Amino acid sequence: MNAKDLRDKTVDELRDELANLKKESFNLRFQQATGQLENTAGIKAARRNAARVKTILNEKAAAAAE
């Protein structure tokens, strides 16, 4: 997921994407705690993707406020 693709989405789509990423992050952390997670890089990727979505949401909010 890159920022260019995210900028093309609507605010509602971004909020849905953020909710999905938070669920995914929770599931990955739960798997890590129970010892089932094999690819620990997924936690970092989910966290960074959530940060990207939040950044784009803030950019859109700032643009709408102007």
Curated annotation (Swiss-Prot):
Pfam families xref list: Ribosomal_L29
Top-rank taxon, per record: Bacteria
Sample GO molecular function, one term: structural constituent of ribosome
Keyword Nucleotide-binding included in the entry's annotation: no
Annotated InterPro entries: Ribosomal_protein_uL29, Ribosomal_uL29, Ribosomal_uL29_sf
Ribonucleoprotein among keywords: yes
Keywords: Ribonucleoprotein, Ribosomal protein
GO process annotations (BP): translation
GO annotation, cellular component aspect: cytosolic large ribosomal subunit
Xref: CDD domains: Ribosomal_L29_HIP (cd00427)
Ranges that cross the membrane: none
PANTHER family with a match to the protein in the record: 60S RIBOSOMAL PROTEIN L35/50S RIBOSOMAL PROTEIN L29, LARGE RIBOSOMAL SUBUNIT PROTEIN UL29C
NCBIfam families for this protein: L29
Family to which the UniProt record says this protein belongs: Belongs to the universal ribosomal protein uL29 family.
Protein name: Large ribosomal subunit protein uL29
Gene giving rise to this polypeptide: rpmC
